[in-house]
Design a protein with these regions (language model features):
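Conserved catalytic-core segment of nucleotide-activated headgroup transferases in glycan assembly
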Residues: 39-42, 155-228
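N-terminal pre-catalytic "stem/leader" segment of glycosyltransferase-like enzymes
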Residues: 1-94, 229, 262-269, 276-283, ...
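Catalytic binding pocket for nucleotide-activated donors in carbohydrate/polymer assembly enzymes
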Residues: 243-315
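Short acidic alpha-helix that forms the nucleotide-activated donor recognition element
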Residues: 90-93, 224-235, 256
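Acidic donor-binding loop of glycosyltransferase active sites
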Residues: 233-246
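A short, active-site helix/loop in glycosyltransferases that binds the activated sugar's phosphate group
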Residues: 108-109, 129-132, 143-164, 200-201
Length: 367
């Protein structure tokens, strides 16, 4: 009887926390050591959106050496509390939520016996099996909800982990990205995950077009976020090559500041890709396209109005307001489902408790 009463109290407390939004939403992150990473910014954007809506959110890091993100994201996220696995006594409760990125699949086993809402976060589907034990499913460890960034990833996850409910939340293309009020500079923004590709493109461009050696290439990799946004809007065109990308924020950021994109279509073709840039499947054609565009730009030729409109239309589903509302709705659905489950469990225990009390009364009457 005492055990039932104790369980009822725990469930009632959990229900109060959920209804008052005082339960904790944990986001597990890795330490970038002050190196800008879009995947970590994505997590911080989720966390900050929920925090600003009144949720109790905490960043969960490995230990006290965690360097944070202020060095490359600024002070915007400073009000997000950071707790550590090794140094803080983190007690995850039944009403809490934990969000685990796909590259942290090696921690799932340690979370298997924890009763809470468990969410996998998949930004790169190629990393799903990198640390997940062979033959294991997320649901083996109690993870039955997934957040990902594209329809392609959602389809892949549904095919493999069909017991999971998959939600799409694209990255926020921040309001820091605004068109420049001045004429673009003769500068080409280039973003290639593989730095050897950047070097190859730049070297080949200068060899093929020696008369354009005065044109500058600006490597956009590993820039602090504010510097990145300010530098991008100064450029006349951007070049993007990233075959491993699942979503690809750089082209959308370029479109948002109003500069056209030249890029290789990655093997995982993004949802947003259409006639909104100068695209090719052949990486060897990138330099030729850049040379043609730069020559036309120097002669005063602009991209046509149809492409400009396509760029604007592409950005509509990725506005800050739309994405933030999507985040809030999805996490609210997690909360509602948890409330429903706890209410059912509480009702069942109360019925059992009442039944025990009733049987006790009957025993007294008989005796």
């Amino acid at each position: 009887m005492n055990k039932n009463k104790e369980n009822m109290e725990k469930l009632s407390d959990a229900l109060d926390n959920l209804n008052n939004k005082t339960n904790i939403i944990y986001f597990l992150v890795y330490d970038t050591r002050n190196n800008p990473r879009a995947s970590v910014k994505y997590i911080y954007d989720l966390a900050l959106t929920l925090k600003e809506d009144g949720s109790n959110v905490k960043i969960l890091a490995e230990d006290k050496t965690y360097s944070g993100v202020s060095g490359w994201l600024g002070d915007k996220y400073n009000n997000l509390e950071v707790v550590t696995i090794k140094d803080d006594r983190v007690e995850i409760k039944i009403d809490d939520v934990i969000v685990v990125p796909e590259y942290y699949s090696n921690v799932l086993e340690s979370l298997a016996n924890i009763r809470c809402t468990k969410v996998m976060l998949v930004q790169q589907k190629e990393y799903i099996f990198e640390t997940l034990p062979i033959g294991s499913r997320w649901s083996d460890y109690g993870f039955d909800r997934v957040i990902t960034t594209t329809e392609l990833s959602k389809k892949y996850i549904n095919d493999i982990f069909n017991e999971c409910l998959v939600h799409i939340i694209p990255p926020i293309i921040g309001d820091e990205f605004v068109p420049s009020e001045t004429t673009p500079k003769p500068v080409i923004a280039i973003s290639c995950k593989d730095r050897s590709i950047s070097k190859k493109i730049i070297s080949e461009f200068y060899i093929r077009y020696p008369h354009l050696r005065w044109i500058t290439f600006r490597d956009m990799i590993n820039m602090p976020y504010a510097d990145f946004a300010n530098s991008l809007k100064e450029c006349m065109v951007s070049v993007w090559v990233d075959d491993d990308s699942t979503f690809g924020t750089f082209p959308l950021e370029s479109m948002k500041v109003g500069i056209p994109v030249i890029g290789k279509i990655p093997k995982n073709e993004p949802d947003w890709l259409s006639e909104n840039g100068m695209w090719t499947y052949d990486e060897s054609k990138i330099v030729e396209i850049v040379g043609t565009y730069v020559t036309a730009w120097l002669e005063g030729v602009e991209i046509n109005d149809e492409v400009k409109q396509k760029m604007k239309d592409t950005l509509l589903p990725y506005s800050t307001e739309v994405t933030k509302n999507n985040i809030l709705n999805i996490f609210d659905s997690f909360r509602s489902k948890r409330i429903d489950a706890i209410e059912k469990a509480l009702t069942k225990i109360k019925e059992e408790f009442d039944s025990i009390l009733d049987s006790g009364k009957e025993t007294e009457q008989i005796s």
